[in-house]
Amino acid sequence: MEKVFNFCAGPAMLPVDVLAQAQKELVNWNGLGTSVMEISHRSKEFIKVAEESEQDLRDLLAIPSNYKVLFCQGGARAQFAAVPLNLLGGNTKADYVDAGYWAQSAVEEAQKYCTPNVINTIIDIDGKKAVQPASEWALSDDAAYVHFCPNETIDGIEINDLPVTDKPIVADMSSTILSRKIDVSKYGVIYAGAQKNIGPAGLTIVIVRDDLLDLASQALPSVLNYGVLADKESMFNTPPTYAWYLAGLVFKWLKSNGGIDAMETHNRKKAAVLYDYIDQSDFYRNDVHSDNRSLMNVPFQLANSELDTKFLELADEAGLKALKGHRVVGGMRASIYNAMPLEGVEALVQFMKEFEEKYV
């Protein structure tokens, strides 16, 4: 079988070692004679999985003790509603920093429950998309919280600053969690869909500061209530146990490979290889200013867009999968999350060189 590298934006590739272990344990986990997906979420065996995975995540991110870690369902889109319904309290206003599609999607949902103050942060620098410095964001004084998405997967835009505010900061880290070091204590809530850097689709991680657990609207469904989920240790209803188990394997894989510091070094090296090649070429281009280029999602365009279909067709034949850009922006996009090895990025760059030589 040819070697395949999956550049899908999500669900994304998982570490090969994790998949191999899951395959080995699929029908007979821990000598029980059953799969881990078949056992009760309240069994002592699965409780151990749950406790270990939470502790490993706490270790990886250095999560302070005054934060709860919730293993939820519904994806990040469910959190677009859960955040205002959990955090507004008696307020009706919240700040939303807008740098792209996913921030805008969060705003659209939040409008059902509050009046968002939307701060458009995208600017143009030398013909490239960039993000305003956080010190220039027009945040309000009376917001319940400030929401932002540090990494916009579609445009490949990364926000490196934190909002300058004394309000709780809420971050949609679906595409950037575990890819680089963060200081969790600076956030009120962090949430992330699992299907990029954590595990398979179906699981969502929420990290929430204790003092924010008692603000929920009375109309909030219990399955989205952070306080309820914290009290029930993420088992108010049956959780996605197999996705939880796989996330636990990914956390152990990260720890065994040097943790977040090593992963950030690895990710910066991968991204540099790809961006450096694009920048020296007249055949390819990236439209994001270097200060705000994503480490995880690298969109690029061909000088001749009529060659897009041929590029994607030949790339697929070469084992370079899922490179088609999002329908909103077109072109190509290479998503190079934690599980993508440097070898995969180097293979993509080599293919790009050969394609350019043939079609320039």
Curated annotation (Swiss-Prot):
Catalysed reaction equations from the record: O-phospho-L-serine + 2-oxoglutarate = 3-phosphooxypyruvate + L-glutamate; 4-(phosphooxy)-L-threonine + 2-oxoglutarate = (R)-3-hydroxy-2-oxo-4-phosphooxybutanoate + L-glutamate
Cell compartments where the protein resides: Cytoplasm
EC numbers, comma separated: 2.6.1.52
InterPro entries reported in the protein's UniProt record: Aminotrans_V_dom, Aminotrans_V_PyrdxlP_BS, Pser_aminoTfrase, PyrdxlP-dep_Trfase, PyrdxlP-dep_Trfase_major, PyrdxlP-dep_Trfase_small
Keywords recorded for this protein, A-Z: Amino-acid biosynthesis, Aminotransferase, Cytoplasm, Pyridoxal phosphate, Pyridoxine biosynthesis, Serine biosynthesis, Transferase
Cofactor binding, per record: Binds 1 pyridoxal phosphate per subunit.
Entry GO MF terms: O-phospho-L-serine:2-oxoglutarate aminotransferase activity; pyridoxal phosphate binding
NCBIfam families on file: PRK05355.1, serC_1
UniProt name for this protein: Phosphoserine aminotransferase
Protein's organism: Aliivibrio fischeri (strain MJ11)
